[in-house]
Amino acid sequence: ILDEIADDMVLLEKQGIRFALDGFGTGYSSLPQLQKLPITRLKLNKSYVQKVTADKDSASVVRAMIYMAHGLELTVVGEGVETEEQKAFLVKNRCDHLQGFFYSEPLTFDGFAKLLNSEGTTARRAYLSVVDK
């Protein structure tokens, strides 16, 4: 069934749709999927990200996943960033994008629009415009 899904994804990719493998390292996400599916972005599961500063084995695993993803020409997103230390670790290890409560709690559309229009969010707007391109 994975081959059938991959074929459908390739057709969608040709129409400009891009795919991310979410929660990499847990559940059904696996190494064979990285090779078979036409994904452009790998999202590291927050269960790994949240342990990088407290557990050296988790830190080693995350470093290896980032390195491997870049070797496959994938963009890497670190999910679940909650602390400055986690952010610093991921930035130091060349994680391309970060997301989590460190930046913002989940927002409604109206709350997001209000955040973008509030004072002091120039850096956030600049970051979002870069990420969105």
Feature-to-residue mapping (PLM):
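EAL-family c-di-GMP phosphodiesterase catalytic domain
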Residues: 1-3, 13-133
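Conserved functional hotspot residues or short segments at active or partner-binding sites
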Residues: 8
